[in-house]
Design a protein with these regions (language model features):
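An N-terminal amphipathic alpha-helical segment
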Residues: 58-85
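Short glycine-rich, low-complexity/disordered patches
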Residues: 20-31, 52-60, 112-128
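Short amphipathic alpha-helices in soluble, non-transmembrane regions
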Residues: 8-17, 40-48, 102-106
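Acidic (E/D-rich), amphipathic helical modules within compact regulatory domains
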Residues: 39-65
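Glycine-rich, often proline-containing surface loops adjacent to acidic residues and nearby aromatics
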Residues: 27-28, 80-91
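Short non-domain terminal segments
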Residues: 8, 12, 85-87, 95
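Acidic, proline/glycine-rich low-complexity IDRs
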Residues: 89-149
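Short, extreme N-terminal segment that most often corresponds to the first beta-strand
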Residues: 1-37, 144-149
Length: 149
């Protein structure tokens, strides 16, 4: 458990430097992930007993795997997009500290299985500074301060 990883701190990290509320679907990515990382990650997610997982593949469209690390918190992995592995979740679903901790647990699993860092940026800022980083080397999940406005 990361003591500084609270729902309030999470909301602050995703808020713009000028205090504007963020768009609700931040962009997550497994840094430098490859197509060959998708299979092991899919297997780990579907076999984790503490996750509820469903997969959707609509006739050749991009396969999406939805994972619920806690009731009411859904993380969508877009495996059909190929590499790097991309995902998103809805900030509005992270109501309390338990929800944020459950998300962090899921992202640590992702980082551990693939052996690569995981970053989450505010929605639409795919090349911007991450608000959240999970370090593969340590398993540490940390929030980064918003850049100065």
């Amino acid at each position: 458990v990361d003591d500084d990883l609270t729902a309030a701190a999470f909301r602050r990290a995703f808020r713009d430097a000028d205090g504007v509320e963020p768009m609700p679907l931040p962009d997550g990515e497994v840094v430098d992930s490859l197509g060959s990382d998708i299979g092991p990650l899919r297997d780990a997610l579907t076999h984790a007993r503490w996750l509820h997982v469903t997969e959707q593949d609509t006739g050749g469209a991009a396969a999406t795997l939805a994972a619920w690390p806690s009731t009411g918190v859904q993380v969508d992995f877009f495996f059909g997009w190929g590499a790097p592995i991309a995902f998103d979740f809805d900030l509005r679903q992270l109501i309390g500290d338990e929800d944020v901790q459950a998300l962090a647990r899921l992202l640590r699993l992702v980082s551990s299985v693939v052996g690569k860092d995981v970053v989450v940026r505010p929605e639409g800022e795919r090349d911007g500074q991450p608000a959240l980083v999970v370090e593969a080397s340590t398993g540490r999940c940390r929030l980064l301060p918003a850049p100065p406005g």
